[in-house]
Amino acid sequence: MLLKRYLIFSVLLVFCLPSYGDQYEAKVIKVIDGDTVWVKSENKHIKIRLSYIDAPELKQTFGIRSKNFLTELILDKNVQVNTNKKDRYNRHLGEIYIHNSNESIFVNAKMIKSGNAWIYKTYRDNSYLKNLENHARINKKGLWEKQDVVAPWDYRRNK
């Protein structure tokens, strides 16, 4: 009987603990750069690092432009956030979606397709994201206007 109570308690505890596989509505309150934002959800401020992408650093060519594009797209808007884990800087890694009456925008993908971010090097084999990046390259969108662009991971390594 004691074992049964313990098992029931354990199962309930697991379901009551917050998880990093969360999906929630939030308002974007600050854009830090082209791949990091602050959102507010239920009076909590949460720092989100957009999954799958790596935007130019602010001091890099196109860094400010990338931030401005993201700002225009999502600042002060209500969004859906899907998070799955945290990075080494304790930021929530997540997907951000804007749902309007007639469309849904996957913000992470929009940053790649518009030429405002690279596919993060871990996800280079994702065919959907690769097609978006190739579209931006072929059409010389955003950072692909120039041929000598430096990927953010190379820029950070060489600083």
Where does each model-flagged region fall?
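Small beta-barrel nucleic-acid-binding modules, primarily SNase/OB-fold domains
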Residues: 2-10, 15-159
